[in-house]
Amino acid sequence: MTTSAPPLVLLVEDDHGVRRPLEKFLQMHHFEVVTAETADDAIDAIHLHHPLAAIIDLRLARGSGRDVVVSMPAGTPVIIFSGVPSESAELERLRPRTRLVQKPYSLTMLVEELKEMISSAKLSQH
């Protein structure tokens, strides 16, 4: 009997008080998580780890989450955090498999959205 590895998710959030609990919550829901605090670190993580999906805060202290979003491979599911919906609306329209989650957000809803997006992406690859 073989078991598949948990889906690898890139979490880009510069606020430790948000990033750490979200990372733990995702791990509790059977995701493997790679974290990054800056846009540069996130872009490096994309190339190094090839995540199956990403959760990205648009407003980072160092760099722009927007740069991370456009660096994700086409077809990779991306959830964008934003307190300002107009910031991410353009990215959501331009990039397939991108969804906006407005702050504040429900962790349960976030995980369900992530699972649905990953499942949909896997189905479209076959």
Walk through the language-model features, giving the residues of each.
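Conserved phosphotransfer microenvironments
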Residues: 57-72, 85
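Acidic, metal-coordinating helix/loop segments flanking the phosphotransfer/catalytic sites
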Residues: 35-53
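Acidic phosphotransfer microenvironment of two-component signaling modules
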Residues: 16, 37-41, 108
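Conserved acidic carboxylate
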Residues: 13
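A Lys-centered signature of the CheY-like receiver
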Residues: 103
